[in-house]
């Protein structure tokens, strides 16, 4: 049975209601059947429509343009041309995609006839529309399987390379992948079981570029524009293609227990140990005198948690991490915060974006609250009634400052508190703001005033 939406209803192919009908529980139950409950490699032909893939291609180009203009190498952008990794990326970033270019036009301008490959990790940080659409598509499967230990990550692949620049390789243990193939060209994935992938003495087993002798022992999967490809964890694999294509790999990221214990310790350090460069002196004290370590221990910002043991502290870190994942629809990486300081008018409509939900809880410290918004933990003080406001926003109904302030008992400061809260939530992409006609008129007037001032100057 096809789950493609009725063409007559699909004025906006990326409408969230359409995506929900298209990738509903029945679709994902069929996915689980085809993949043997996510244990078998499989191509899913009943996927995205051509219109949806074209829109997603545009979103990916916009991501590449944003990275090229603002972030550049900050988020692990890698480029290969004619089989060689490019170390100096500034000339490439200067040729970023333009708004009026499709993927064929841009790649012809940026690369000509050369073979190239781009890999960008943490793709979920960038395009809000692409991340939102993918989150809605994936929402049912997360309810079925639970939250992966370290959530969901995206890797963006763009290129016309003959084969993956990484050679025959395995991804990190515990990462099973759902590949959204956006085309336009097809791609073929070769997959090996450990016992079938036999390397010669002295031959590299991981990142093996000696591909030809091993293709016959691999399982081959070819997928086309709009199709999905699923690969379980811990598989040797290699992607090959002759034509240009874009792929969005969604990773369900689980970890082994030892590695995740290390991750919790890393998070404990990041949250509780501020940077310091104070130099220590040689310790002249007797062997049992540990007083010299006090300046070191005082660096830890534990406040009223100093008497807690290691395990309770790490459990607290894990709970915060879970709240972050659930507030971000499972995404491992939070979106890039907005930099504009928005002025929310009294009649502007404010609401959350589906399928994201904020989480509010009372901090153990009296009068303190924590709000988890799109993976970011925000701590607030003296905000009785905050839980009610978050619950109302999570309902998805647009609300004004006055309506939200009416939920608080503090009549004098309610509107001021709500306006501050909404500005913080907007900064971390927890809410969207639809300006009222009055706000739009003021904004238009400001633009005219700035234009006249600039002209006079």
Question: PLM features: residue spans?
Answer:
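An N-terminal JmjN-like helical accessory module and its immediate linker preceding a catalytic domain
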Residues: 1-89, 394
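Residue-level preference for the first positions of well-ordered beta-strands
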Residues: 41-43, 117, 228
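Generic detection of long, well-ordered alpha-helical segments
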Residues: 50-57, 124-135, 307, 311, ...
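Fe(II)/2-oxoglutarate
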Residues: 2-33, 210-218, 222, 238-457
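Acidic/polar N-terminal loop/beta-strand segments that form early-domain functional surfaces
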Residues: 45-49, 123, 374, 436
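Histidine-centered metal-chelating micro-motifs
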Residues: 228-229, 233-238
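Active-site region of the double-stranded beta-helix
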Residues: 29, 33-34, 50, 69-225, ...
């Amino acid at each position: 049975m096809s789950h493609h939406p009725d063409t007559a209803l699909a004025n906006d192919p990326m409408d969230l209601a359409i995506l929900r009908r298209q990738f509903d529980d029945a679709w994902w139950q069929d996915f689980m059947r085809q993949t043997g409950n996510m244990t078998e490699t499989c191509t899913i032909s009943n996927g995205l429509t051509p219109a949806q893939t074209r829109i997603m291609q545009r979103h990916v180009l916009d991501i590449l343009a944003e990275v090229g203009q603002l972030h550049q190498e900050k988020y692990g952008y890698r480029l290969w041309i004619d089989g060689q990794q490019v170390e100096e990326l500034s000339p490439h970033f200067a040729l970023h995609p333009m708004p009026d270019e499709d993927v064929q036009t841009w790649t012809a301008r940026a690369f000509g006839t050369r073979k190239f490959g781009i890999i960008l990790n943490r793709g979920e940080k960038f395009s809000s529309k692409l991340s939102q659409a993918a989150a809605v598509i994936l929402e049912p499967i997360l309810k079925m399987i639970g939250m992966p230990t370290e959530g969901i990550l995206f890797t963006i692949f763009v290129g016309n390379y003959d084969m993956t620049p990484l050679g025959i390789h395995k991804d990190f243990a515990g990462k099973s992948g759902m590949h959204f193939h956006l085309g336009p060209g097809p791609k073929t994935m070769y997959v090996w079981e450990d016992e079938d992938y036999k390397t010669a003495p002295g031959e590299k087993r991981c990142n093996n570029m000696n591909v030809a002798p091993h293709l016959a022992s691999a399982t081959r999967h070819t997928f086309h524009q709009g199709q999905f490809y699923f690969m379980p964890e811990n598989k040797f694999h290699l992607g090959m293609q002759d034509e240009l294509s874009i792929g969005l790999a969604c990773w369900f990221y689980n970890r082994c227990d030892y590695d995740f214990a290390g991750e919790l310790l890393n998070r404990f350090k990041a949250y509780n140990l501020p940077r310091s460069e104070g130099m220590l002196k040689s310790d002249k004290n007797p062997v049992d005198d540990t007083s010299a370590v006090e300046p070191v221990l005082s660096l830890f910002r534990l406040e009223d948690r100093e008497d807690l043991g290691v395990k309770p502290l790490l459990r607290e870190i894990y709970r915060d991490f879970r709240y972050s994942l659930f507030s971000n629809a499972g995404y491992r990486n939070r979106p890039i915060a907005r930099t504009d300081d928005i002025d929310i008018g009294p009649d502007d409509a404010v609401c959350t974006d589906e399928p994201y939900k904020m989480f509010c809880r009372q901090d153990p410290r009296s009068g303190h609250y924590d709000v988890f918004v799109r993976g970011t933990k925000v701590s607030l003080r003296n905000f009785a009634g905050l839980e009610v406001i978050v619950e109302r926003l999570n309902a998805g109904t647009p609300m004004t400052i006055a309506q939200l302030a009416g939920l608080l008992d503090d009549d004098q400061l309610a509107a001021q508190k709500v306006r501050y809260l909404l500005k913080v939530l907007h900064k971390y992409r927890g809410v969207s703001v639809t300006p009222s006609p009055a706000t739009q008129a003021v904004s238009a007037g400001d633009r005219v005033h700035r234009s006249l001032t600039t002209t006079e100057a």
